[in-house]
Swiss-Prot record:
Residues where lipid is bound covalently (S-palmitoyl cysteine): 2, 12
Gene it is expressed from: Rgs16
UniProt-listed GO biological process terms: G protein-coupled receptor signaling pathway; negative regulation of signal transduction; positive regulation of GTPase activity
Domain RGS residues, every copy: 64-180
Tissue: Predominantly found in the retina. Some expression has been found in the liver.
Modification Phosphotyrosine, positions: 167, 176
PTM section of the record: Palmitoylated on Cys-2 and/or Cys-12. Phosphorylated. Phosphorylation at Tyr-167 by EGFR enhances GTPase accelerating (GAP) activity toward GNAI1.
Protein name as catalogued: Regulator of G-protein signaling 16
Quaternary structure note: Interacts with GNAI1 and GNAQ. Interacts with GNAI3, GNAI3 and GNAO1.
Amino acid sequence: MCRTIATFPNTCLERAKEFKTRLGIFLHKSELSSDTGGNGKFEWASKLSKERSFSEDVLGWRESFQSLLNSKNGVAAFHAFLKTEFSEENLEFWLACEEFKKIRSATKLASRAHHIFDEYIRSEAPKEVNIDHETRELTKTNLQAATTSCFDVAQGKTRTLMEKDSYPRFLKSPAYRDLAAQASATSASGSSPAEPSHT
């Protein structure tokens, strides 16, 4: 993270530029994917509708953390931001838990539970999330009879941490504020948003 900006100003600046670039590329891809369609008037109307929908989506991210998590684009933008803070493991764990809950096979459930534990929960895990010792031990105990709810406590604590800590910083980030300003202008005028900066 950029806590020691006086000591490492270039590193923080580079991470901020990287986030802005990633978000710009992400937005450019979103615009390209919305360009497919029919000819003439219908294509223009369809594109305008998608741009308004995307603008509403972007503006909706600031309404609540749940709104951000409910948006595929929001999750992608938030993930890009978290990478600049070296804390993407929190969101990746939360997403892994959401996918885990969809597993119906008991064999796959147990196997996937151990994989998630080894990847995010155990001490010194490659992507260890910031949870307390009691939650870590409870989750370890839950693995003995893995169910779709065995990560619920750890997932809840990670979600709360992101909501109270990372999410407010995401909303205050220059990249999101620029994006929200473009989205507001698009919603107000009904015109196409400006091409995002890739610098």
